[in-house]
Design a protein with these regions (language model features):
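Short, hydrophobic/aromatic-rich beta-strand segments within well-structured domains
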Residues: 34-38, 48-49, 125-127
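Acidic, metal-coordinating catalytic segment for phosphate/diphosphate chemistry
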Residues: 1-43
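Residue-level detector of high-confidence beta-strand sites
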Residues: 16, 50, 101-103
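Residues immediately flanking
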Residues: 9, 52, 152
Length: 184
């Protein structure tokens, strides 16, 4: 079982923990870490998105943040971000290759695989500054079925129009990234 810190509205651990399953059953506030892999081509920003495996408990088969995961109880955001980047994409990075970009909150209720899912997260956002060859990444097959580069503006425009047919990227997370890149 994976345990998470229950956090207050500012994302600070309260000293209590909850199982990941219970956090999503009851919508209990917990922490996650997201990492954006960003490139530039012909003067335009592009982002590497992962396609979530069909077995994922939420948003199966959709394109999502480059790398993301829950922060285990007792852990801190930066080491968790580095761990997820390594586990999901096979990118082994040192802490100096991740820039802290900001935080955001997300809360929603949906049904996946016929089961209610209540998410309530305080997310720390990082940007990976190292080189990436998408073709040589070692993907965690249980979580990620593929990765693909997308034009950042294309993803942003689609999400702003409310079109969620391809992307489950949190709009607030993309907004933090855009602010970091000076696009706001």
């Amino acid at each position: 079982l994976e345990y998470l810190d229950i956090v207050d509205e500012d994302g600070r651990p309260t000293g209590r923990t909850v199982s990941r399953r219970e956090a999503h059953d009851r919508g209990i506030l917990h922490r996650t870490a997201h990492v954006w892999v960003v490139g530039k081509e012909r003067g335009r920003f592009r982002i590497l998105l992962q396609k979530r495996s069909e077995e994922k408990e939420s948003f199966p088969g959709m394109f999502d943040t480059s790398s993301a995961g829950h922060i285990p109880a007792g852990a801190e955001p930066l080491p968790s971000a580095l761990r997820e980047l390594s586990e999901e994409l096979g990118i082994t990075a040192s802490p100096d290759l991740l820039d802290f970009a900001g935080t955001f909150r997300s809360r929603y209720e949906k049904v996946f695989h016929g089961r209610p899912f209540r998410d309530n997260e305080a997310t720390s956002v990082y940007v990976y500054k190292g080189p990436v060859d998408a073709g040589s990444l070692k993907l965690q097959e249980s979580e990620v079925s593929q990765v693909r580069w997308f034009d950042l503006d294309e993803v942003w425009d689609e999400i702003q129009r409310g079109d969620r047919s391809r992307f489950c990227v949190p709009a607030a997370g993309l907004q933090v990234l855009r602010g970091y890149l000076g696009l706001q």
